[in-house]
Amino acid sequence: MSRGRFSYSFQNFDPERMARASGRDLRISPKHSVELLREIRGMMLNDALRYLDDVIAKKRPVPMKRFNDSQGHKPGKGFGPGRYPVKVAKAVKKILLNAKNNAEQKGLDVDRLKIIHAAAHRGPVLRGYIPRAFGRATPFNEQTTHIEIVVEEIRR
């Protein structure tokens, strides 16, 4: 579902020191995306990729700080409510690798890249329904999410 051009919510983008990537209309949970991106924002790019690999392997949970109603605590010292959003982690990893390749194409040092902006926005709802008995129907909608990542080469 391509809708043409879009703009990033990140302001003051410097093309000399920064690279960016985005995923549009992804069929992943907006709530899990917000929680996961909060966790990787501010990380070095390579550390974030390792963290996402651990989430996909269900070794490290993602802390749920906002959307945590009836959420079980996860093992670990002082760890509260958390989950393993594997589907979201795979999608975010793809976008991070895209940002890494974009930075490499610009000639930036990929070992010094830091995630300075990671945001998730709700996308359009894909409407569907399930036919029920006696001519009724139950809505069966699917949420979509827009994700944007900006990385910056930090100076030594």
UniProtKB/Swiss-Prot annotation:
Signal peptide: none annotated. The keyword RNA-binding applies. Pfam families: Ribosomal_L22. The keyword RNA-binding applies. GO terms for cellular component: cytosolic large ribosomal subunit. GO terms for biological process: cytoplasmic translation. CDD domains: Ribosomal_L22. GO terms for molecular function: rRNA binding; structural constituent of ribosome. It comes from the Archaea. InterPro entries: Ribosomal_uL22, Ribosomal_uL22_CS, Ribosomal_uL22_euk/arc, Ribosomal_uL22_sf. SUPFAM superfamilies: Ribosomal protein L22 (SSF54843). Transmembrane segments: none annotated. Keywords: Ribonucleoprotein, Ribosomal protein, RNA-binding, rRNA-binding. Belongs to the universal ribosomal protein uL22 family. Part of the 50S ribosomal subunit. This protein binds specifically to 23S rRNA. It makes multiple contacts with different domains of the 23S rRNA in the assembled 50S subunit and ribosome. The globular domain of the protein is located near the polypeptide exit tunnel on the outside of the subunit, while an extended beta-hairpin is found that lines the wall of the exit tunnel in the center of the 70S ribosome. HAMAP family: Ribosomal_uL22_A (MF_01331_A). This is Large ribosomal subunit protein uL22. The gene is rpl22.
